[in-house]
Amino acid sequence: MVRNSEITLEQIFKEGRINLENDDYNCVICSFPLFDGLQCKRGHGACKSCWEKIIGENGKKECHSCRISIKSLDDLSKNLYLEKEIFKQKVACLNNGREKFGNTLVIKSDGGCKRQDIPIEKLLHHIKNECGYLLIDCKYSRDCKYYKQISLEQHQNECQFMSIHCPALCGKKDSRMNINKHLETPNSCKPLISINNSNNSNGNGNGIDDESIIKLSNSIVEIQKSYQNQIKKIKENSESEIAALKDSLYYSKSRIKNLEDEVEELKDRFSTLESMINKLDDSATSRSGTILINGWKMKLKSLDVGHSIVEEQFYIGTNRFYIRIYPFGDSYDNQGYVTVKLGRIDGEEYHLDIGLKVSIKGFDNKKKVLLSYYPGDIAHNIDQLVETWETSKEFKMILHFKVDLKPKIK
């Protein structure tokens, strides 16, 4: 834990009390954080202490990395961006009740501050004003043990070196240690109470002797001690309960943070699933593809009206379809057209609007295309392309198609 409220951030860094996992924030020479880092003209950095050794009497007076000449600290500059990033880093409070012995991290039994997320730039303010676990040196004696900042009142009630007045009202003021001895020594404490012996040689005018007054004073002292012990127990129990509540609050906050992270993860997963569902929806209502027919011209020589050159089968959702191409028309009524026939083989029985788009290359002369849809056994001509395509000398035929299923609007 940190001792002495006058501690500075520079001391904390130089004592190695802060460890940063990112090596970019640590000095390449001493490995301590670059609290007061400086860099040469070429951007190579180190902490101020290491630079002072480099330019010192026995130093090489050159950059440890690029060997550029460094005669004084005036030849160096600050990396303000890096300094700002370092001070943004979050660390645990130094009063966390943990100490490191070698490579072993030991959690001390007296506990400590639970804060784990303090920006370095706010660390000193937290330690001095918020934490309560700062170790304070007793101002009454160097022989007295230090105490935690949150235990100031308890320490003042118990410190054996603190000056107090005698509770028996004798007027004596001394350290608590000496006052206790004073009270325990017979006849050493004489209360400042006027005693009148005019009517009674062994007492005052009211018949109360000195011994009774001393007994009364001692009773008052015992009552005060008992009261202080009860107050001490109440404070100890209260501190224990407060510490337990702080622990519970810390772990609750940690759990909330974990739950928030889980919520964000679930949101990402939901977004991914939603995207996948949308893609599945697209695949269930639409299908596009390309049909390539090599040796197109040779195949035309052996075909006539009503003969198809190719059949392509595919699924859209649970519906199975086929596409057939009739170079000379699927019937004599359609002779002179290239018929592209879309038919449904099986699937769900419901009415659909079918959108079929094709583009064909590979004919020697200009032709029109007739698109037919066969939902069952009867053909329905759904579109007739009026546009034509340019003559191609290729010996292959390419058909690009896209089929969209849309529910009919009644």
Curated annotation (Swiss-Prot):
Zinc finger (TRAF-type): 81-154, 154-213
Zinc finger (RING-type): 27-67
Coiled-coil region(s): 216-284
GO cellular component, as recorded: cytoplasm
GO MF annotation terms: microtubule binding; zinc ion binding
Protein's UniProt keywords contain Repeat: yes
Keyword S-adenosyl-L-methionine appears in the UniProt entry: no
Alphabetized UniProt keyword annotations: Coiled coil, Cytoplasm, Metal-binding, Repeat, Zinc, Zinc-finger
Family annotation (SUPFAM superfamilies): RING/U-box, TRAF domain-like
Compartments in which it is found: Cytoplasm
Entry's free-text remark on domains: The MATH/TRAF domain binds to receptor cytoplasmic domains.
Protein's job: Probable adapter protein and signal transducer that links members of the tumor necrosis factor receptor family to different signaling pathways by association with the receptor cytoplasmic domain and kinases.
PANTHER family assigned: RING-TYPE DOMAIN-CONTAINING PROTEIN-RELATED (PTHR10131:SF156), TNF RECEPTOR ASSOCIATED FACTOR (PTHR10131)
Family to which this protein belongs: Belongs to the TNF receptor-associated factor family.
Name this polypeptide is given: TNF receptor-associated factor family protein DDB_G0279745
Organism: Dictyostelium discoideum (Social amoeba)
